[in-house]
Amino acid sequence: MSDILVVEDEAIIRTALKRLLERHHYQVAEAGSVSEACERHNLDNFDLIISDLRLPGEPGTELIRRAANTPVLIMTSYASLRSAVDSMKLGAVDYIAKPFDHDEMVETVQRIIASGSSARATAQNIR
């Protein structure tokens, strides 16, 4: 079972995303900001971090730097597509527009986690 951290300041969105992912057999932890995520969790223990771009305090892209070994999927509104591209340049593994389509979110998560598992297996075989 894969572990996912959802960082979203809007409780309704955070809860909906958690339920969606749990229905697909993911273990989900939550935080409402970057600082809360860092204080409550070891970011390297997750297979994926899904974060809103605009959060109170620091932007979601700060998690890319703080969780260098964990892929970060950025969620953004349609109005901030330019910010999504900038997030990718900073190292986000992908972005998804809000409001997100449930099937698209699950497919994106599955793809990222499968890709990460393959990369980890390859790295272990090289050692």
Show the residue positions of the predicted features.
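Acidic, metal-coordinating helix/loop segments flanking the phosphotransfer/catalytic sites
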Residues: L5, E30-L48
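Two-component/phosphorelay signaling modules centered on CheY-like receiver
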Residues: A11-A29
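The feature encodes the CheY-like receiver
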Residues: R14, P56, S80
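Acidic catalytic/metal-coordinating carboxylates
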Residues: S33, P59-E62
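Active-site residues of response regulator receiver
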Residues: D52
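C-terminal output helix
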Residues: S80-R82, I96, F100-Q110
